[in-house]
Amino acid sequence: MASNAKRRALEPERLLEKHKEDEEDMEGDESEESDDIEEDESEEDEEVNEEVNIDFEAYTISDADYDGIKKLLKQLFLKAHVNISELTDLLIQQNHIGSAIKQAEGQDDSDDDEDDDHVFGVISLVNLTERKGTACVEQIKELILSRCEENCEQSLVEQFDKVLNDNSKPVGFLLSERFINVPAQIALPMHQQLQKELADSQRTNKPCGKCHYYLILSKTFMEATKTSKGSVGSQAKEELMFANAEDEFFYEKALVKFNYSVQEESDTQLGGRWSFSDVPMKPLRTAMLVPAERMNSIMDKFKEYLSV
């Protein structure tokens, strides 16, 4: 069980689990054996709409969360050359910041003890400037710069390169990942708590304190018929769909940003072969650099979004 040193109750969220109804009964006369099979299948495949109340709590990241965090990072990086095992270890080592989101204790919706420590989401930050030279950190920077070179004009590449390699203005890689069935409401208290922890770290001279910029890598989608290459403007923004709703507010406040396709890497369900309203969607990643001073206004926008 994860450490209870930093348990924070989050608002209970109502999740709707739907089990799809299979096929309708076949018309026409069937043999007696076929009728019996059809009756059995009809009973088994009857549509069930079940509402499940789940209370989430935020816990201090611990060794027990290793597999769960690694799985969440895998859905972000897919097949990119980033050592997510090392990155996961780093998040665990610096657990004075960040949270693992799990089901609240005392709920018995599952009979499987193995699910007791299931990680539904994680939020943390890696200070790329402080961790300069660490393999996974250098790989993250190389990933962003190489994809930028492949998809953007040289001026944008130079902007990203300058910010990522300016030791006088630290850059924090902001990680906020969760599974798709976890509602967006959970993200606001997670981000607010992280900002408090970062402020405390700066005040006490602990790692990951002051950041001038946040680097965010967001899971986004676009209609398969649209182009995603290059830097993105207002028209492209309207065509983007965000896996994490709050990422749109970071996008709006970003200093620079660009998209790149991960369609060739998304060969698993975690990668997200999505469709909306029967329209095939192309999976992307959107890289953003957001000035830290804009975080308060981003959180305000997110509050407005949740209040509607």
Curated annotation (Swiss-Prot):
Chief location bin: nucleus
Pfam families membership: BCCIP
Region (Disordered): 1-53
Biased composition (Basic and acidic residues): 8-21
Keywords: Cell cycle, Cytoplasm, Cytoskeleton, DNA damage, DNA repair, Nucleus
Gene Ontology CC terms: centriole; centrosome; cytoplasm; mitotic spindle pole; nucleus
Annotated localization: Nucleus; Cytoplasm, Cytoskeleton, Microtubule organizing center, Centrosome, Centriole; Cytoplasm, Cytoskeleton, Spindle pole
Keyword Nucleotide-binding in annotation: no
Family: Belongs to the BCP1 family.
Protein name as catalogued: Protein BCCIP homolog
Primary gene name: bccip
